Amino acid sequence: QHWSDYFKPG
């Protein structure tokens, strides 16, 4: 997973 997945999962 990427750090952005925690802010905008998808």
From Swiss-Prot:
GNRH neurons lie within blood sinuses close to the gonoducts and gonads in both juveniles and adults, implying that the neuropeptide is released into the bloodstream. The modification Pyrrolidone carboxylic acid is found at Q1. It comes from the Eukaryota. Transmembrane segments: none annotated. GO terms for molecular function: hormone activity. The modification Glycine amide is found at G10. InterPro entries: GnRH. Its main location: secreted. Keywords: Amidation, Hormone, Pyrrolidone carboxylic acid, Secreted. GO terms for cellular component: extracellular region. It is found in: Secreted. Belongs to the GnRH family. Stimulates the secretion of gonadotropins; it stimulates the secretion of both luteinizing and follicle-stimulating hormones. This is Gonadoliberin-1. It comes from Chelyosoma productum. The lineage of its organism: Eukaryota, Metazoa, Chordata, Tunicata, Ascidiacea.
